[in-house]
Amino acid sequence: MPKIVDHHQRRTEIIWGLWAVISERGIEGVTFQAVARAAGISVGRIQHYFASKDELVLAGCSAIVDGASTEHEDRSTGLDAWEVLIELLVHPIPRTPEFRIGVSVWYAYLVRAFVDPRIAEIMRSAIRGTREEAEELLRLAGAPVIHGARLAALSQGLTQQVLTGAMDPDEAVTILEAEVDHLRSESGALETRS
C-alpha cells in the first residue's frame, strides 16, 4: 500500500522551521541546513518542496501574512464593527512568547522588503489591507474613515514598542482600546446631533 503524504503538512513544518531560524538569526541566517535542523527534517525534504532559499523565504512571507489574516478572521467571528476594529488593531501586539517570535519574524520580513521587491509587494499589500479594513470598519460603524490610517499606524508603533520591550503589552492594548472607545463615543455624539 503506498504511503499517503500530507504535502501541506510537510510544507508547514518546513515553514515553521524557517521562522524559527529567522527569529534566532534573521533572514540572512537562513540556509537549508539550518531550517532542516530547526524543523527536525532532512535537507532533501526541503529541496523537494523549495528550489532555492529565496523561494523558501518568499513562501514563509506569504504564509505569515496568510496565517495572520486567517487568525484575525477566526477571532472576529460574531463581533460587531467596533469589536472587529479593536481585534484588528490589538492582534499584532505580542502578548505571548510564541507570538513575540511571530512578530519578530514579521519585522525581519519588513526589513527584507527594502531589498526584495517580491517581499515588498506582499508586505505593502498586507499593511495597506490593514489600513483599508480599519477604514471599512469605521465606515460600517458610522465613524469618520479618516481615522483608519491613524489607528493602523498607532497599532504598528505600539507593536514595535512592545517588541523592543519599551512598553508592556497590556498598556499597548489599553491605549488602542481607549482610542477606539473615544472614536465610538464621538461617533455616538455625531449621530445624536444629526
Which functions belong to the PLM regions below?
Residues 51-55, 76, 80, 93-97, ...:
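Residues in soluble alpha-helical coiled-coils and helical-bundle/repeat scaffolds
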Residues 59, 70-102, 147-151:
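Hydrophobic alpha-helical connector segments
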Residues 89-92, 106-110, 151, 155-158:
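Short alpha-helical scaffolding segments that buttress acidic/His motifs in well-ordered protein cores
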Residues 69, 98-107, 114-141, 149:
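Amphipathic alpha-helical packing segments from all-alpha helical-bundle domains
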